[in-house]
């Protein structure tokens, strides 16, 4: 007879909203798609008009939340970054222009696509705890991401490949208690060496 078998250990329910619970592999996957615009901040951004730095951007991706506060995402983005250069390069087009202070410059456009992987941190859940399933709490959430990617310039005679760094702060407004659909506002920085 096993005397230690007489007392069984059973899991106890807890209301601790800060406990870490991982999920099964197929749970908590998501897809993302966003369109927006960005401003290219290069070395010569001040020689021309600000409107000449604005460009559209498209991103699609897939990700997974491992815990309510920590996840990863794989993302593909494509855009062109418009800016200015004080010398002709692979990225410049058109004729020479002159700034108000007499500085000569050229308009530039860098076409690129980027594949990146990022770690995501749901700041709302990390600081306030998990709100529970189908809850009307935390309908507004803030998510920070940091990652690394591979960026490819295209449409120039010499193709360029380089590493990229990614920083992002996202505000999500969920539209249902299930939190399966949201409208997001993102501030994102993609950092890369332009080599011109």
Predicted regions and their residues:
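Short glycine/proline- and aromatic-enriched beta-strand/turn motifs that initiate or cap beta-hairpins
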Residues: 1-63
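Transmembrane beta-barrel domains of outer membrane proteins
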Residues: 22, 54, 61-63, 120-124, ...
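Hydrophobic, lipid-facing positions within transmembrane beta-strands of outer-membrane proteins
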Residues: 29-31, 56-60, 113-117, 163-169
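Membrane-spanning beta-strand positions in outer-membrane beta-barrel proteins
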Residues: 30, 71, 143, 170, ...
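Transmembrane beta-strand segments that form the barrel wall of outer-membrane beta-barrel proteins
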Residues: 31-43, 78-79, 141-154, 187-193
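Solvent-exposed loop/turn segments connecting transmembrane beta-strands
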Residues: 47-53, 154-164, 196
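Gram-negative (and chloroplast) outer-membrane scaffold detector with strong preference
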Residues: 68-165, 175-179
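Extended serine/threonine-enriched, polar tracts that run as long, contiguous segments within proteins
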Residues: 164-196
């Amino acid at each position: 007879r096993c005397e230690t078998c007489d007392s069984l250990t059973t899991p106890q329910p807890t209301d601790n909203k800060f406990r870490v619970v991982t999920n099964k592999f197929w749970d908590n996957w998501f897809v993302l798609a966003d369109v927006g615009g960005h401003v290219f901040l290069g070395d010569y951004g001040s020689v021309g008009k600000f409107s000449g730095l604005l460009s559209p951007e498209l991103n699609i991706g897939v990700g997974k939340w491992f815990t309510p506060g920590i996840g990863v995402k794989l993302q593909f983005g494509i855009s062109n970054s418009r800016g200015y250069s004080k010398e002709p390069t692979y990225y410049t087009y058109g004729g020479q222009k002159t700034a108000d202070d007499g500085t000569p410059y050229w308009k530039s456009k860098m076409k690129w696509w980027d594949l990146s992987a990022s770690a995501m941190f749901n700041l709302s859940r990390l600081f306030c705890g998990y709100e529970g399933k189908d809850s009307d709490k935390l309908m507004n959430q803030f998510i920070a991401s940091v990652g690394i990617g591979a960026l490819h310039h295209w449409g120039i005679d010499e193709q360029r490949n380089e590493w990229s760094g990614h920083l992002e702060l996202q505000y999500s407004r969920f539209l249902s208690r299930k939190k399966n659909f949201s409208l997001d506002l993102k501030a994102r920085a993609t950092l890369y060496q332009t080599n011109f």
